[in-house]
Amino acid sequence: MSKISFKGDLKEGIKIIIDPNLNWDEIRNLIVDEIKSKEGFLKGSSIYVDFQGKDIKDEDWQEFRKEIYEKYGIMLSKELYRLRISNSNNAKIVLGPIRSGKSLNVKDNLLVIGDVNSGSEIICNKNVFVLGKVRGSIWAGYENNDKATIFALELEPEKIQIARYILDLSKIKKEKTGVGYWVYVENGEVKLNRYSGGKKNG
């Protein structure tokens, strides 16, 4: 196989597959070269990196993710594509960022592969999954569906709401552990937890 291969698919998302025989420096350089060559297309998106079982030090990975996001506005993940929307036939998938000033209204589940920029809004009656950073507003379960949930890699929102419940934004804390945030309603209150490897950390 080639040392690195890039694949993009609306159902499976955008991913980079890595030859596990490469060392970390080679992997870093190849990913950067791949992103540079497609920067215009990829900016504001999220990419799943498949290391095919190769063990990567978490501190190296987190430092690299931060570097890529700051330079190119691209969020890398090696965990998140374990998530699946249960009925893909009833899900809307948006590839690329939701830009400022845009309003997106969806009846079914929504998967956004990219950022939700400030000044934009998402209104969705079911679950919202954002493989990127939320800076705008999200209202899930707008028809009083308090079973709806929101997932995002990063949260710096203007507003988060599920059904009639609004998240207290002061609850959002930046942590090094976990790969994203779950937002859901429990006992009449919007709760927020970090997500890590298939479980929510309270």
Curated annotation (Swiss-Prot):
Summarize the subunit comment.
Interacts with MinD and FtsZ.
**Coiled-coil stretches, from where to where?**
none
**Would you identify the family this protein belongs to, as annotated?**
Belongs to the MinC family.
Q: Which HAMAP family does this chain map to?
A: MinC (MF_00267)
Q: What is this protein called?
A: Probable septum site-determining protein MinC
Gene3D superfamilies for this protein = 2.160.20.70
Instruction: Write down the InterPro entries for this protein, in alphabetical order.
Output: CAP/MinC_C, MinC, MinC_C_sf, MinC_N, Septum_form_inhib_MinC_C
**Sorted alphabetically, which keywords does the UniProt record give?**
Cell cycle, Cell division, Septation
Can you name the source organism?
Dictyoglomus turgidum (strain DSM 6724 / Z-1310)
Q: Upper taxonomic classification of the species?
A: Bacteria, Pseudomonadati, Dictyoglomota, Dictyoglomia, Dictyoglomales
List the Pfam families. Answer: MinC_C, MinC_N
Which one GO biological process term can you cite for this protein?
cell morphogenesis
Describe the function of this protein: Cell division inhibitor that blocks the formation of polar Z ring septums. Rapidly oscillates between the poles of the cell to destabilize FtsZ filaments that have formed before they mature into polar Z rings. Prevents FtsZ polymerization.
